[in-house]
């Protein structure tokens, strides 16, 4: 089966191919003889009732000196594609939300979109953990300064993070006696006008913030533990963390069993769970990464498995709701 697959992503010229999961997917698509088309968010638009895309044929090579080649662009109905992979990175802002509306309309016109646009919109990567409280650390979401201060007093050590960012951006670690608590809260909440998430600090982050990839709700049997650099508590590769491949623990598998069926039901077919110690901290649905690092450390073709799943899913899907 040869599919026409669109990949909606941030500019390909700016990616670091050795650690880019979207690039791993592109290599796998090409290896399986699919036609790959490249789009950026601004390439998708609504004209009257049709969703159109300015798309270019894309060829890729695992070569850091020249990793892509693009044809001239053509404007076509988006549903001229068979499948579209939505791989736009956060921030999760209103531009992202509007893009999911366009993709949802394209879906109704016959395009198979992965992950499902309505679920990308609904499943905020921080807030979605609230559906699984038995898996998470003590958590608070609020814009109220007094409520945040009370939570910090109760938990002694917390992290506070925005709901729409990525890669460890604007995450603060606070202790109960930190003199900066008021200014951090005021800044993060925009003086009480913006919701933020606070979670009990998990000391095991020093041993690694684990990323687990799930395909159709089933975990890859390995995790990428991202170990924070000295002097930092954030286990993000973009912040200098070191990636170390490990096998899943029994607790990791248990958390995946709790979350996986809901992901499958929502059409969230490619997801990255973040687990620190024994606790689920985030559910990454927009453009989870970690595949290239895991494939380099273990004899596993995660991107190939995902594309094989897409082929089967597309072949058996006759009515995309």
UniProtKB/Swiss-Prot annotation:
Database matches in Pfam families: GSH-S_ATP (PF02955), GSH-S_N (PF02951)
MF term (GO), any: ATP binding
Gene: gshB
HAMAP family per UniProt: GSH_S (MF_00162)
Catalytic reaction annotation: gamma-L-glutamyl-L-cysteine + glycine + ATP = glutathione + ADP + phosphate + H(+)
One GO cellular component, as annotated: cytoplasm
Binding site for Mg(2+): 282, 284
Family, as annotated: Belongs to the prokaryotic GSH synthase family.
Cofactor note: Binds 1 Mg(2+) or Mn(2+) ion per subunit.
EC main group: ligase
Descriptive protein name: Glutathione synthetase
Claim: Translocase is one of the keywords in the record: no
Binding-site list for ATP: 151-208
Domain ATP-grasp: 125-311
InterPro entries referenced in this protein's UniProt entry, alphabetically: ATP-grasp, ATP_grasp_subdomain_1, Glut_synth_pro, GSHS_ATP-bd, GSHS_N, PreATP-grasp_dom_sf
Cofactor(s) required, per the database record: Mg(2+); Mn(2+)
Listed pathway(s): Sulfur metabolism; glutathione biosynthesis; glutathione from L-cysteine and L-glutamate: step 2/2
Keyword ATP-binding: yes
């Amino acid at each position: 089966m040869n599919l026409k697959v669109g990949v909606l992503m941030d500019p390909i010229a700016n990616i670091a191919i050795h650690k880019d999961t979207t690039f791993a997917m592109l290599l796998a698509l090409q290896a399986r003889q699919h036609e790959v088309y490249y789009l950026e968010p601004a390439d998708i638009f609504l004209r009257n009732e049709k969703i159109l895309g300015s798309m270019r044929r894309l060829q890729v090579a695992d070569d850091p000196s020249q990793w892509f080649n693009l044809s001239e662009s053509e404007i076509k109905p988006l549903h001229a594609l068979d499948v579209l992979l939505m791989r736009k990175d956060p921030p999760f802002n209103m531009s992202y939300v509007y893009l999911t509306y366009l993709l949802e309309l394209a879906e109704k016109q016959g395009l198979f979109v992965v992950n499902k646009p309505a679920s990308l919109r609904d499943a905020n990567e921080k807030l979605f953990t609230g559906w699984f409280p038995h898996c998470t650390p003590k958590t608070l979401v609020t814009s109220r300064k007094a409520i945040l201060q009370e939570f910090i007093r109760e938990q002694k050590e917390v992290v506070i993070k925005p709901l729409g960012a990525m890669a460890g951006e604007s995450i603060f670690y606070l202790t109960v006696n930190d003199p900066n608590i008021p200014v951090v809260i005021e800044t993060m909440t925009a003086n009480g006008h913006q919701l933020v998430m606070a979670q009990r600090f998990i000391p095991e982050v020093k041993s690694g913030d684990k990323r687990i990839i799930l395909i159709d709700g089933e975990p890859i049997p390995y995790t990428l533990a991202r170990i924070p650099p000295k002097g930092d508590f954030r286990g993000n590769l973009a912040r200098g963390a070191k990636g170390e491949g490990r096998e899943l623990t029994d607790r990791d598998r248990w958390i995946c069993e709790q979350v996986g069926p809901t992901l499958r039901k929502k059409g969230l077919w490619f997801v990255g769970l973040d687990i620190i110690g024994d606790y689920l901290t985030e559910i990454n649905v927009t453009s989870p990464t970690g595949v290239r690092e895991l494939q380099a450390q273990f004899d596993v073709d995660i991107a190939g498995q995902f594309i094989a799943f897409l082929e089967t899913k597309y072949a058996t899907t006759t009515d995309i709701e």
